[in-house]
Amino acid sequence: MTQLEFYQAKLAYEIDAADVKAALDAGEKVILIDTRAAGAFERETIPGALSLPHRTMSAQTTAALPRDALLVPFCDGIGCNGSTNGAIKLLQLGFRVKELQGGLDWWKRDGYATVGSHAVAATSIQCAC
């Protein structure tokens, strides 16, 4: 694999907060999947996200998810591999997947709101890219 192919592949498998928000705002079929434990989801998550902890993912727990949507798993951030584990399981189950870069942490750093008992309001968009 060349370096160019590596970066092209990376963009095929990952998505950042700004691109997720733009896709959602455009009405694209994107479903955010919070792969953390239910308690973490209740404390704070991305608006519209579904709670589906990666440890519970199976054909049964994902049966209601649409096959034509892009599923975007996320977890706390770069120190957490829950979204990667979730992406693997979702791919094995036949879904189309892109992992959210930086997870919930980078979502908030980019200025987007969260919901839950520890929700934060949206701020000015911080992403400089």
Go through each PLM region and give its residues.
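Flexible, polar/low-complexity N-terminal or interdomain linker segments that lie immediately upstream
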Residues: M1-L32, A37-R43, G116-C129
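Short phosphate-binding/catalytic loops that engage adenosine nucleotides
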Residues: E28, G94-R96, Y112
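Conserved beta-strand positions in the Rossmann-like core of class I SAM-dependent methyltransferases
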Residues: I31, L50, K98
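Short loop/helix-cap segments at secondary-structure boundaries that form the rim of catalytic
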Residues: F41-P47, W107
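Short, hinge-like loop/turn segments at secondary-structure boundaries
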Residues: L50, D68, T114-H118
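Glycine-rich, highly charged phosphate/nucleotide-binding loops
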Residues: L52-Q60
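Short secondary-structure capping/turn micro-motifs that flank functional sites
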Residues: M57-S58, W106-W107, T123-S124
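Catalytic cysteine-centered active loop of the rhodanese-like fold, especially the PTP/DSP P-loop
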Residues: T62-K108
